[in-house]
Amino acid sequence: MTDILTNIFTILSRMSLAEGFGFNTDIFETNILNLAVVLGILLTSGREFFVSLLQNRQQNILQSINDADERYKEAAEKLQQAQNEFEQAKLEADQILAQSKKTASEIEVGLMNLIKEDTKKLLDMKQATISFEEEKAISEIRRQVIRLALQRALEQSKSRLNRRLQKRVTRLNIGLLGRLVTPNDV
């Protein structure tokens, strides 16, 4: 700024006083003079206006920077919180997956045990049914054999024995039958 004023005074001092006021056709010289005058007026009269304008602009810029920093900090906090929540959700998902695998394994073992038990019960029931049917068939065959034997014995005893001998043989056969036939067979 002092350079400008120095230049103005240098130019004014080089001018002769006799020339006075007039029309200067040198564009470069007149522009410098005009600029110097305008700047001088602006610096003296509008200094407070420009200072307050620059201060307001500086405050607005600083406020914008502070707001941007605050928004950045909030965004960083939200990002960190979201990352923490994501990690927590990931851990919970891993735990749920591990628990479901464990539960599935336990259910599989339980089902296999139930299948084994049911198979064993079915085999036992099958064997019991077979044994029961065998006993039933044997019992039926015994009855038929005994009945046929009795019929034959009676027929033979009628033809060969007298009454007294028939009674004795009959009692003996009844006694033998009583021992052979159990209460379940009747």
UniProtKB/Swiss-Prot annotation:
Topology within the bilayer: Single-pass membrane protein
Residue intervals passing through the bilayer: 27-43
GO cellular component term, pick one: proton-transporting ATP synthase complex
Extra facts: In plastids the F-type ATPase is also known as CF(1)CF(0).
Domain of life the protein comes from: Eukaryota
PANTHER family to which the protein is assigned, alphabetical: ATP SYNTHASE SUBUNIT B, CHLOROPLASTIC
Gene coding for it: atpF
Subcellular localization, as worded in the UniProt entry: Plastid, Chloroplast thylakoid membrane
CDD domains assigned to the protein according to its UniProt record, in alphabetical order: ATP-synt_Fo_b
Pfam family, one: ATP-synt_B
Subunit composition and interactions: F-type ATPases have 2 components, F(1) - the catalytic core - and F(0) - the membrane proton channel. F(1) has five subunits: alpha(3), beta(3), gamma(1), delta(1), epsilon(1). F(0) has four main subunits: a(1), b(1), b'(1) and c(10-14). The alpha and beta chains form an alternating ring which encloses part of the gamma chain. F(1) is attached to F(0) by a central stalk formed by the gamma and epsilon chains, while a peripheral stalk is formed by the delta, b and b' chains.
Function according to Swiss-Prot or TrEMBL: F(1)F(0) ATP synthase produces ATP from ADP in the presence of a proton or sodium gradient. F-type ATPases consist of two structural domains, F(1) containing the extramembraneous catalytic core and F(0) containing the membrane proton channel, linked together by a central stalk and a peripheral stalk. During catalysis, ATP synthesis in the catalytic domain of F(1) is coupled via a rotary mechanism of the central stalk subunits to proton translocation.
InterPro entries referenced in this protein's UniProt entry, alphabetically: ATP_synth_b/b'su_bac/chlpt
UniProt keyword terms in alphabetical order: ATP synthesis, ATP-binding, CF(0), Chloroplast, Hydrogen ion transport, Ion transport, Membrane, Nucleotide-binding, Plastid, Thylakoid, Transmembrane, Transmembrane helix, Transport
Name used for this protein in its record: ATP synthase subunit b, chloroplastic
Lineage summary: Eukaryota, Viridiplantae, Streptophyta, Mesostigmatophyceae, Mesostigmatales
GO terms, molecular function: ATP binding; proton-transporting ATP synthase activity, rotational mechanism
